[in-house]
Amino acid sequence: MPAFKTLDDLTDIAGKRVLLRVDLNVPVSGGKVTDATRIERVAPTIKELSAKGAKVILLAHFGRPKGEPVADMSLSQIISAVEEVLDQAVAFGEDCVGEPAERAVAALNNGDILLLENTRFHKGEEKNDADFTAELAKNGDIYVNDAFSAAHRAHASTEGLAHILPAYAGRTMQAELEALEKGLGKPTHPVVAIVGGAKVSSKIDLLMNLVKKVDALVIGGGMANTFIAAQGIDVGKSLCEHDLAATAKQIMIEAETAGCTIVLPVDGVVAREFKANAANETVSVSAIPADAMMLDVGPKSVAVVNDWITKAATLVWNGPLGAFEIPPFDTATVSAAKHAAERSKAGKLVSVAGGGDTVSALNHAGVVDDFSYVSTAGGAFLEWMEGKELPGVAVLTRPA
């Protein structure tokens, strides 16, 4: 990955106006933030810039207002949550451009923090419109992007500003890029990837890219059924995309050509009902009853997965191995997650995980803090795993 500038390259910024792009798209219920994780992630960058005497101006989106103001998508409702995390007062600007923004910025003292209104209240944001980008840039001397989770979008505040102002990566962006470089960019081999989740259709590009980069690809979750069925095995009533049999076969051919071992379940936990503590049994994948569905991979399969984790120097994980939300079909995911966490804690494994369900699964297993890096980025993490260029990253790493 080409070099990118970080906060370490930002010296003597007292009094400078720093436009800091952050991800504050947090869940809100009844006017209260229910999960402040994304605020907590960007807090170190905000605090560092403030401590250095910069005038910190936060740019963020919230929801999908489609280019016009929507009252319940105003960032004003999260101000108190941001202040609580930072333990510092945060001013609010009633627009992100124009006179309200300019007035709010002009009132800042060194070290002050200002949150401007939702950038997506303007159509120019998602269009990456040059005039809108120039209006945003009026209020800054320096641009810092700390929103990796929005880096897959070429919007005005995530990509456009870096063409106008000196551009730097914030601490969250820096940590994410460094972790991803260790995960797939320049990893230590053997590299093992675990990919789970419900559908192959949503992860075709991902699987096609991974087989060319990893030594072993473990496939779990509902998507494993599609690969099993593609080999002519009856999977009963299991979730399965039968119309993607040819795609599954092609992925297996690509893997063989690239020297990547595809690891599929050899046994599974099956049930007739999709509910907690449903009556279940463990069977070979070749003996799934016609009226049953596989909801988790079985103990023999878990042993194989854990053996691959033991062999690995690097692990990239996206998607659970089974229906982890419903016990006892969380057993395989929890077992593999705990094994990977132990190897990581012992310094024997670099483990990088990401994607919404993955983070939930690792939280469920109680091991999020023990993985080398857990990305909360969702779509950007997936596109990175697919080998796609992320506009918000590319613009930071372009030659000056």
From Swiss-Prot:
Its main location: cytoplasm. Pathway: Carbohydrate degradation; glycolysis; pyruvate from D-glyceraldehyde 3-phosphate: step 2/5. InterPro entries: Phosphoglycerate_kinase, Phosphoglycerate_kinase_CS, Phosphoglycerate_kinase_N, Phosphoglycerate_kinase_sf. ATP binds at residues 203, 325, 355-358. Keywords: ATP-binding, Cytoplasm, Glycolysis, Kinase, Nucleotide-binding, Transferase. It is an enzyme of class 2 (transferase). Substrate binds at residues 23-25, 38, 61-64, 120, 153. Its EC number is 2.7.2.3. GO terms for molecular function: ADP binding; ATP binding; phosphoglycerate kinase activity. It catalyses: (2R)-3-phosphoglycerate + ATP = (2R)-3-phospho-glyceroyl phosphate + ADP. It holds the Pfam family PGK. HAMAP family: Phosphoglyc_kinase (MF_00145). PANTHER family: PHOSPHOGLYCERATE KINASE (PTHR11406), PHOSPHOGLYCERATE KINASE 1, CHLOROPLASTIC-RELATED (PTHR11406:SF23). It comes from the Bacteria. GO terms for biological process: gluconeogenesis; glycolytic process. It comes from Allorhizobium ampelinum (strain ATCC BAA-846 / DSM 112012 / S4). This is Phosphoglycerate kinase. One of its GO terms (cellular component) is cytosol. It is found in: Cytoplasm. Belongs to the phosphoglycerate kinase family. Monomer.
